Amino acid sequence: MYKATIVIPNINGKGWLKDSIESVYAQTEQNFRLIVVDNGSTDESLEQARSYCSRENFTLIENGTNTGFSHAVNQGIALADSEYVVLFNNDAFAEPQWLAELLRTADADPKIFAVQSLMIRHFERELADDAGDYV
């Protein structure tokens, strides 16, 4: 069993998906499964995703049509066989310590049920895009 399952929903992410996946595989924490759920991409991103299918910890779900973000995410979650599930957008890029820090935070207290990263804007790196929500 993996420590984390990372789910990336994708539709027409040709310009970002490969770099997004590569940033996940560059993590210092390697105890994860990566699931990409493709929602009927018509660009080259589906082929980009298929190029990772030989990796043991990679799963690709091909929907053929756009079933929507929530459905795609739920498909990935349904296949999760790990302690944690991590949602990751197809246009996001992670620093090498990202997953290790998320898991360390989640493990710090049994009362923690959700964690979120500080997201920095890609082209305006001095600006935060999202800093989480209070639940």
Q: Residue locations for each model-derived region?
A:
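Glycine-rich, basic loop-to-helix element that forms the pyrophosphate-binding segment
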Residues: 62-80, 90
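Active-site beta-to-alpha loop of glycosyltransferases that engages the nucleotide-sugar donor
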Residues: 8-19, 29, 40
